[in-house]
Amino acid sequence: MILQLHGGGYTGAVRNAYYVFAGLYNELSHGCNVLTPDYRVAPENPYPAALEDALASYRWLLSKGYYGEQIILAGDSAGGGLAMALCMYLRDHNMPVPGGIIAMSPWTDLTASGESYETNYEKDPLFGNTKESLIYQNDYPGEHDRMDPYISPLFGDFRGFPPMLIQVGSIEMLLSDSVSVAAKAREQGVKVRLSVYEGMFHVFQMAYLNIPESKKAWAEAGKFIDVLRTDSRL
């Protein structure tokens, strides 16, 4: 079972693109079911609404008989960060953690403190060259501290996490979010595969199978799922 948490900066609802993502996950996993909740978003529903809805979806899967290790959390951008935040919450509250996490260009640092926010500022075709993007103008945290690990997982503890696959483009401003999380998680004993795709932009996997880099990334995700299947009944 794959629980897919969509991106959109915590302000955009689920889009048709994520149904395509769901189909790809289903195909690459050789038939895994995929649940894509349309979680509440800001500004009407700031933190912790998205986390609460992700948790409710996970609890629903457990109520249907799935074990934690049978569930893979998958997410892109905000959804990737939300997947990590959910895993932290589950661990912190003694609930079953998932069997793995797939994070595509995860947004893990809502303080925008990473080096790549500066070095890729003029390179990033989506968020670059402006301070008016969702990276800087975002209502999700509300009155809460942006360094809260349930908002910015980078500042949390990754001990007890399952294996993670993290994919990111080399020219996106969120590059540091992935690199820093991978380094920290590895230091804390987590198995992490970090794949930096040269010349790629934020969530380039939305090109589906139409460009070589995206095709390779989806194939990598499929192989990661295959590895996890050897240790659980996905």
Name what the model sees in each region.
Residues 1-234:
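Alpha/beta-hydrolase superfamily serine-hydrolase fold, recognizing
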